[in-house]
Amino acid sequence: MTDEVAISSGLSEEEAKKRAVKGYCVYDWGKSSFETSVVTAILPAWVAYLFLEANGLTGNILGIEMTADAIWSYAITIAALSVAIVSPSFGIIADRRAIKMWWLKILTWLGAGGTLLLAFAPLLPISTQWVWLIVMFVFANIGLNGAGVFYNALLPHMGEDDEKDAISNRAFAYGYLGGGLLLLVHLGMVMLLSLIHISEPTRPY
C-alpha cells in the first residue's frame, strides 16, 4: 500500500508510509465522529422529536403501530443486515484483490453523502422529515459499515508486524478524539439553539 502511495505521489517510501498511516488514522477520526454523533447521540433524538411532532407517540407504519425507538431499531437492523449479506463477498475482494482503496472510497462517499443529505430534512414538510432522516441514515450506515470491511483490511499494509499495534492504537486515539470533539460541538449547538428558543419573546395571538 505504501509503495503504491509512493509511486502515485512521487514521495519517498518513508514519506509515503507516514502519509498512509496519517490517512488511516484520520479516517478513524471521521468514522468515530459519525458513530458518536449520528448513530448514538444526536440523530436518534432528532428523529424521535420529529416523529412525535408528526405522529404522536405511535404511528401506523405498514399497518403496524410503532414508536420512534422501534423505527430507529429497524433502521439500524436493515443497515446491519444489508452489510452482513454482502460482507463475505467484500471480504474475498479485500483479501484477494488490490482494489481495497477503490471500494473504500466508493462506500465512504455513500456514507458521507447520506450524512450530508440529512441536513436537507428541514426543507421538507414536518410529516416527512423523520422519514427522510431514516432513509438517509440507512444509506449512510451501510456506507460506514461496508467501508469498515476494507478499512480494517488495510492495517496489514500500513507497516511491519511490530508496528501494527502502535498504528492501530494511534487510529483508536484519533477516533476517540474526533468523536469526542464533534460531539461537544454538536451538544454546544443544541444548547445554543435551546437558549435562543427560550429567549424568544412570546407572540400574542
At which residue positions do the language-model features occur?
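Helix-loop boundary and gating motifs at the non-cytosolic
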Residues: S12-A80
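Loop-to-transmembrane helix entry/capping segments in MFS-fold secondary transporters
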Residues: D69, D161-F172
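Cytoplasmic membrane-interface "Motif A"-like loop-to-helix N-cap segments
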Residues: A94-L110
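C-terminal ends and interior cores of transmembrane alpha-helices
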Residues: T108-S127
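Hydrophobic core of transmembrane alpha-helices in multi-pass small-molecule transporters
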Residues: G114, T128-A147
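Intracellular juxtamembrane helix-capping segments at the cytosolic ends
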Residues: G146-G159
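Glycine-rich segments within core transmembrane alpha-helices of 12-TM secondary carriers
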Residues: S168-V190
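Single conserved hydrophobic/aromatic residue that forms the stacking wall/gate
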Residues: I196-Y205
